[in-house]
C-alpha cells in the first residue's frame, strides 16, 4: 500500500512538470507567410498600446472640437508641454512659435511633420518654428517624451513632437473662424489697487480679435494609386495690451502687501557729491522739481503698454502628393510656404542712473530757470564742490561768491515717454520642399 502511494505521487508530479514546459513547433506546423516587413528608426509608428516608450496622441476629433487657430494651442493642453515663443511673448520675442517639452528647452525638443524635421525659424535659435504647421491640416499629434534621443540624437533629449497631416484627402473644404477676447475686468482686488494709485481702470473690454480662413482640396487618381492635396490658410490677429486687463493695468510691487508701482527711473535726478539735497528729486509734468516721496505717479507703469498678445498676420500655403509607380515604389512630394508678420511692443527705453556732466554756470542750475522756483528743489543745490576747509559748497553758492565755473556731475534716470514704446517688427518667410521615393 505504501509503495502504491509513492508511484501515484511520482506520476502526478511528472504530469504537472510536463504541463509547464513550453511547446515546440515541428515540421508538421505550417509556415507563417509575411507579405511585408517595415523597419523604421522612428518609434512614433507604434500605437500607444504597444509602444515601449511613453506616447501621447491628440486626434483630429479633439483638435477640431477645440477650434484652435494656432497649432501650438493644440499641444499646449498637455501638462508636459510648454510653449516658449507664442503671440503672448513680447519681451524677448523672436517672432516665432516654439515648443518646449518638460521644460528642458525648445532647442532640445525635436519637431517633425510626417516624420521629417522642421527647419529652425529664427537665425538666432535652432528651435523649430511651428508656425509652418497649419492647424487645419493636422490629422493627429504624436508626442514621445522618453528615449527619443537614442533614435534622433541630442536635439531630442526632451522628446519628439510629430505632426501627422491629412493624407488622401478628396473633395473641398472651406473654414472661417472668428474669435475675440471679452473681459469684464471686475476683479475687485485689482480695482482697489488701481483706485488707490489713481491708475486707469480699463472696465469691460473686447480686444484681440482674430480671423482665420482655410481652404483644403484634394483629388485621387482614377486608378487609386495616387493623390494630390492643396491647402491654404490666412490668419489675422489684433494686438492686446496690458492696460486692456485689470490684472495688467498696473505693475504690482510688494509680496505681502502688493501695490501698484513700476519703475523708479522716471524723471529723476540725484546729486553725486557732498551734502547737497538729500535723496532723489522728481520732475513734475510742469517742470517743477520736488523731493521724491515714492508717490505712485512718480513710478513708471511699464506693464500697461506691454503686449499681452502680439498682432499677427500669417499665410500658409502648401501642396503634397504621392503616386505608386510600382507595387513596391512610391514617389512623393511635400511643399510648404509660410510668411509671418508680427510686432512686439514693450515699455519705453530708459536711462538707468546714467551720469552726466555739466558746468556750475549752466542755466539749468542757476536762478531764473522755471525749475528753480523758490518753493521747489533747485538743481544748483544738488551738486557742487568742497572748499579749502573741506566744507561742501553748492553750485549756486559757488557761483554767487564770484568763483569760476567748475565741472559737476549728476545722476539722471528718465523714461523716453516722448519717443513712445519700443516696437520690434518681425517678418519670417520659410519655404520647405521634400521630394523622394519610398518603398
What does each of the following model-derived ranges do?
Residues 72, 76-117:
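Extracytoplasmic beta-strand/coil segments of soluble accessory domains associated
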Residues 33, 95-97, 105, 315, ...:
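Short, basic and Ser/Thr-rich N-terminal targeting/leader segments
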Residues 1-66, 73-76, 214, 218-220, ...:
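N-terminal Sec signal peptide and the immediately downstream disordered periplasmic leader
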Residues 32, 104, 128, 136-139:
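Structured loop/turn residues at beta-strand edges in well-structured enzyme cores
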Residues 35-40, 54-59, 64, 74, ...:
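Soluble periplasmic/extracytoplasmic beta-strand elements of cell-envelope proteins
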Residues 45-49, 109-111, 182-185:
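Short, solvent-exposed loop/turn elements at domain surfaces
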Residues 31-32, 103-105, 166-167, 222-223:
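Extracellular/periplasmic catalytic domains that process cell-envelope and extracellular macromolecules
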Residues 73, 77, 90, 116-132, ...:
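Surface-exposed beta-strand-turn/loop segments characteristic
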Amino acid at each position: 500500500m505504501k509503495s502504491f502511494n509513492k508511484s501515484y505521487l511520482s506520476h502526478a508530479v511528472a504530469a504537472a512538470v510536463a504541463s509547464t514546459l513550453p511547446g515546440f513547433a515541428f515540421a508538421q506546423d505550417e509556415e507563417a507567410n509575411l507579405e511585408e516587413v517595415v523597419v523604421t528608426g522612428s518609434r512614433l509608428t507604434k500605437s500607444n498600446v504597444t509602444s515601449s516608450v511613453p506616447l501621447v496622441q491628440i486626434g483630429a476629433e479633439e483638435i477640431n472640437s477645440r477650434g484652435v487657430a494656432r497649432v501650438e494651442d493644440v499641444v499646449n493642453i498637455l501638462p508636459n508641454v510648454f510653449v516658449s515663443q507664442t503671440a503672448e511673448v513680447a519681451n524677448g520675442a523672436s517672432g516665432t512659435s516654439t515648443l518646449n517639452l518638460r521644460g528642458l528647452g525648445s532647442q532640445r525638443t525635436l519637431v517633425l511633420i510626417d516624420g521629417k524635421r522642421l527647419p529652425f525659424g529664427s537665425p538666432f535659435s535652432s528651435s523649430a518654428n511651428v508656425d509652418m504647421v497649419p492647424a487645419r491640416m493636422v490629422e493627429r499629434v504624436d508626442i514621445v517624451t522618453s528615449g527619443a534621443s537614442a533614435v534622433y540624437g541630442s536635439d531630442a533629449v526632451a522628446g519628439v513632437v510629430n505632426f501627422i497631416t491629412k493624407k488622401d484627402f478628396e473633395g473641398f473644404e472651406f473654414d472661417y473662424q472668428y474669435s475675440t477676447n471679452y473681459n469684464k475686468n471686475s476683479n475687485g482686488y485689482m480695482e482697489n489697487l488701481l483706485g488707490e494709485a489713481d491708475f486707469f481702470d480699463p472696465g469691460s473690454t473686447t480686444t484681440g480679435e482674430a480671423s482665420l480662413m482655410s481652404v483644403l482640396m484634394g483629388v485621387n487618381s482614377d486608378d487609386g494609386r495616387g493623390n494630390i492635396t492643396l491647402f491654404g490658410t490666412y490668419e489675422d490677429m489684433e494686438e492686446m495690451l496690458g492696460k486692456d486687463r485689470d490684472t495688467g493695468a498696473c505693475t504690482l510691487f510688494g509680496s505681502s502687501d502688493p501695490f501698484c508701482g513700476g519703475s523708479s527711473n522716471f524723471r529723476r535726478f540725484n546729486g553725486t557729491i557732498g551734502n547737497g539735497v538729500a535723496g532723489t528729486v522728481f520732475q513734475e509734468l510742469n517742470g517743477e522739481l520736488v523731493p521724491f516721496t515714492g508717490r505712485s505717479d512718480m513710478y513708471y507703469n511699464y506693464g500697461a503698454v506691454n503686449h499681452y498678445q502680439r498682432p499677427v498676420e500669417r499665410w500658409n500655403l502648401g501642396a503634397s502628393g504621392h503616386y505608386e509607380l510600382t507595387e513596391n515604389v512610391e514617389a512623393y512630394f511635400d511643399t510648404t510656404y509660410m510668411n509671418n508678420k508680427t510686432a512686439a511692443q514693450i515699455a519705453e527705453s530708459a536711462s538707468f542712473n546714467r551720469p552726466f556732466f555739466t558746468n556750475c554756470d549752466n542755466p539749468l542750475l542757476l536762478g531764473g530757470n522755471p525749475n528753480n522756483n523758490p518753493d521747489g528743489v533747485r538743481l544748483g543745490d544738488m551738486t557742487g564742490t568742497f572748499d579749502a576747509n573741506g566744507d561742501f559748497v553748492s553750485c549756486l553758492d559757488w557761483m554767487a561768491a564770484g568763483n569760476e565755473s567748475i565741472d559737476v556731475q549728476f545722476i539722471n534716470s528718465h523714461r523716453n515717454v516722448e519717443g513712445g514704446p519700443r516696437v520690434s517688427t518681425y517678418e519670417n518667410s520659410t519655404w520647405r520642399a521634400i521630394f523622394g521615393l519610398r518603398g
